């Protein structure tokens, strides 16, 4: 799970409120998710955002070019430029995570993250999503992640609660018990 700094949350909140005032929340959310996916898949972009070797001006112009070519909304393009100008380009992923949380809350949706050792099928995801919806009494959006180190089983995070029913966790508990015996 992504850790968000207070600064990233403040930028995300400002963008969220501005997009809400302009009636542009869905567009900004779509642009932000697309840009976050780009960051996650491009090592060069991550290096540009994170490295102090690139000047703020270089970051601003590169982000402006990306926003233009990707067809992002002008508001989102300005937001990226502002973060880079203020030396916060490395906080963009954290801001996306915070914005996503604000957007989900505004829509009355709870977010859950499920980790498994191998990719889940669509039916498995749907079943978990519907079970969680019944538990929380509302809509749930499920994000799945693959983590082979779990060996098997499942980890489920809903808000601040974590249920760890992975084989790795069970082995860890057994190891702890055996060391203590």
UniProtKB/Swiss-Prot annotation:
- Which Gene Ontology molecular function entries are recorded, alphabetically? proton-transporting ATP synthase activity, rotational mechanism
Q: Which GO terms describe its cellular component?
A: plasma membrane; proton-transporting ATP synthase complex
List the SUPFAM superfamilies hit by this protein, alphabetically.
N-terminal domain of the delta subunit of the F1F0-ATP synthase (SSF47928)
Q: What InterPro entries does the record point to?
A: ATP_synth_OSCP/delta_N_sf, ATPase_OSCP/d_CS, ATPase_OSCP/dsu
Q: How does it sit in the membrane?
A: Peripheral membrane protein
The family database entries (PROSITE patterns) matched by this protein are listed as: ATPASE_DELTA
User: What is the annotated localization of this protein?
Assistant: Cell inner membrane
Alphabetized UniProt keyword annotations: ATP synthesis, Cell inner membrane, Cell membrane, CF(1), Hydrogen ion transport, Ion transport, Membrane, Transport
Q: What Gene3D superfamilies does UniProt report for this protein, alphabetically?
A: N-terminal domain of the delta subunit of the F1F0-ATP synthase (1.10.520.20)
- Please classify the protein's predominant subcellular localization into one broad category: membrane
Q: Which domain of life is it from?
A: Bacteria
Q: What is its quaternary makeup?
A: F-type ATPases have 2 components, F(1) - the catalytic core - and F(0) - the membrane proton channel. F(1) has five subunits: alpha(3), beta(3), gamma(1), delta(1), epsilon(1). F(0) has three main subunits: a(1), b(2) and c(10-14). The alpha and beta chains form an alternating ring which encloses part of the gamma chain. F(1) is attached to F(0) by a central stalk formed by the gamma and epsilon chains, while a peripheral stalk is formed by the delta and b chains.
Question: What task does this protein carry out?
Answer: F(1)F(0) ATP synthase produces ATP from ADP in the presence of a proton or sodium gradient. F-type ATPases consist of two structural domains, F(1) containing the extramembraneous catalytic core and F(0) containing the membrane proton channel, linked together by a central stalk and a peripheral stalk. During catalysis, ATP synthesis in the catalytic domain of F(1) is coupled via a rotary mechanism of the central stalk subunits to proton translocation. This protein is part of the stalk that links CF(0) to CF(1). It either transmits conformational changes from CF(0) to CF(1) or is implicated in proton conduction.
Its family remark reads: Belongs to the ATPase delta chain family.
Q: Which PANTHER family does its entry note? A: ATP SYNTHASE DELTA CHAIN
Q: What is this protein called?
A: ATP synthase subunit delta
Origin organism of this chain?
A: Hyphomonas neptunium (strain ATCC 15444)
**The encoding gene:** atpH
């Amino acid at each position: 799970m992504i850790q968000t700094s207070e600064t990233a949350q403040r930028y995300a909140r400002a963008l969220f409120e501005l997009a809400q005032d302009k009636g542009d929340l869905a567009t900004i959310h779509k642009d932000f998710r697309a840009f976050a996916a780009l960051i996650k898949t491009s090592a060069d972009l991550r290096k540009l955002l994170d490295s102090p070797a690139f000047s703020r001006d270089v970051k601003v112009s590169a982000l402006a070019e990306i926003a233009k070519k990707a067809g992002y909304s002008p508001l989102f393009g300005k937001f990226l430029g502002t973060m880079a100008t203020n030396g916060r380009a490395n906080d963009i992923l954290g801001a996306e995570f915070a914005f996503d949380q604000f957007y989900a809350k505004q829509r009355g949706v709870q977010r859950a993250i499920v980790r498994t050792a191998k990719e889940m099928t669509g039916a498995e995801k749907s079943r978990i999503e519907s079970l969680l919806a019944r538990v929380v009494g509302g809509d749930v959006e499920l994000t799945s992640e693959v983590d082979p180190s779990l060996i098997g089983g499942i980890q489920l995070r809903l808000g601040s609660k974590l249920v760890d029913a992975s084989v790795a966790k069970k082995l860890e508990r057994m190891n702890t018990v055996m060391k203590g015996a």
